[in-house]
Amino acid sequence: MQKSLHSKLFKIIGFFGGSFDPIHYGHLKNAAQLKDKLRLSKLFLMPCDKPVHKKQLNFSINQRIDMLHLAIKEFNTLSIDTREIKQNKNSYTINSLKYIQSKYQNNSICLIMGMDSFNTLSSWEECQNFYQYCHLVIMSRPGILTYQKKYGFRLTNIINDLTKQKTGFIFFANNQMLNISSSTIQGKIKSQKNLSGLLPDSIINYINAL
């Protein structure tokens, strides 16, 4: 019997990290769209406890987790990973990647981030080693491609490449992204402006009840 010439393909698991302060439609709709586009077997929203690159957060750990659980009732194809929250210390992505790789040894791992985060990657702890633990997926707007060869990743625009090996590629998703930011929402909360259309009604009700 002739052996198959096809190499093994790996199921892809995505991890979208952030402070989610608060989680909003910009996060949720873009994540759901990306899960479908990349055919991810799972996409985890991974909230951090104490983000190294941000100042004090507006919502507590428990409040942010509560809002994430409310969010995935509407976006039920998404999941939550609370590993970084449970560490109760500064959140270094490299530590999470090492843990994730050890837990999901038979999967391709995608670390998902927006363009703003990618543009600060040079300041992240051990960023030059990320390629050993994951693929990097950047949620960028169509036409935006500012990648230079660094961090050890190889550029690809072929989704199937992410299934052929577990780590090492960078992929620009070119989503039709919603232009919503947590800072805009925080400003509206402080000035008591309408939040409709920016985040799920269940989260708006939660915030209003605080």
From Swiss-Prot:
Function, in words: Catalyzes the reversible adenylation of nicotinate mononucleotide (NaMN) to nicotinic acid adenine dinucleotide (NaAD).
Family as reported in the entry's similarity comment: Belongs to the NadD family.
Protein name: Probable nicotinate-nucleotide adenylyltransferase
GO molecular function, one term: nicotinate-nucleotide adenylyltransferase activity
Keywords: ATP-binding, NAD, Nucleotide-binding, Nucleotidyltransferase, Pyridine nucleotide biosynthesis, Transferase
Enzyme Commission number, as recorded: 2.7.7.18
Pathway named in the protein's UniProt entry: Cofactor biosynthesis; NAD(+) biosynthesis; deamido-NAD(+) from nicotinate D-ribonucleotide: step 1/1
GO biological process, one term: NAD biosynthetic process
Stored CDD domains: NMNAT
Species name: Vesicomyosocius okutanii subsp. Calyptogena okutanii (strain HA)
Keyword Oxidoreductase: no
Pfam families: CTP_transf_like
Catalysed reactions, semicolon-separated: nicotinate beta-D-ribonucleotide + ATP + H(+) = deamido-NAD(+) + diphosphate
